[in-house]
UniProtKB/Swiss-Prot annotation:
Residues bearing the modification Phosphoserine: 58
Cysteine pairings via disulfide bonds: none
Protein name: Photosystem II 10 kDa polypeptide, chloroplastic
Database matches in InterPro entries: PSII_PsbR (IPR006814)
Organism: Arabidopsis thaliana
Subcellular location, record wording: Plastid, Chloroplast thylakoid membrane
Record PANTHER family: PHOTOSYSTEM II 10 KDA POLYPEPTIDE, CHLOROPLASTIC
Cellular component per GO, a single term: chloroplast
Gene symbol of the encoding locus: PSBR
Function: Associated with the oxygen-evolving complex of photosystem II.
Molecular function per GO: mRNA binding
Top-level taxon: Eukaryota
Pfam families recorded: PsbR
Principal place of residence: plastid
């Protein structure tokens, strides 16, 4: 009986949907302020290379067309040598022949470096084997 009295006194009324345009404290604003400084490029920076990186300038296309069906213009990778000082492979080459060591016969770390490398590798392998053994049924 008490429950029916409470239910009759509580009624739900639908409320209209309204949006208030008040700024909440602590929340960032969606409007952006204009920056006080301007970034200006200083010009074209040419890459200095003795010879361009990459393959030769000719392009060997099957039936004379590329993958999209367009006829090749024959630029190859050397199109930008005069403009930027290097071809498209010259912007971030993987290696530079001028930075190679004189010979690859001797490890620069010497015998001590090889010994440290071997001990480290053996320790990693032994530690892995120990972990496998300790978590297996053989350790029980």
């Amino acid at each position: 009986m008490a429950a029916s009295v409470m239910l009759s006194s509580v009624t739900l009324k639908p409320a209209g949907f309204t949006v208030e345009k008040t700024a909440a404290r602590g929340l960032p604003s969606l409007t952006r302020a204009r920056p006080s400084f301007k970034i200006v490029a200083s010009g074209v920076k040419k890459i200095k290379t003795d010879k361009p990186f990459g393959i030769n300038g000719s392009m060997d296309l099957r039936d004379g067309v590329d993958a999209s069906g367009r006829k090749g213009k024959g630029y190859g990778v050397y199109k930008y040598v005069d403009k930027y000082g290097a071809n498209v492979d010259g912007y971030s080459p993987i290696y530079n022949e001028n930075e190679w060591s004189a010979s690859g016969d001797v490890y620069k770390g010497g015998v001590t470096g090889l010994a440290i490398w071997a001990v480290t590798l053996a320790g990693i392998l032994a530690g892995g084997a120990l972990l496998v053994y300790n978590t297996s049924a053989l350790a029980q």
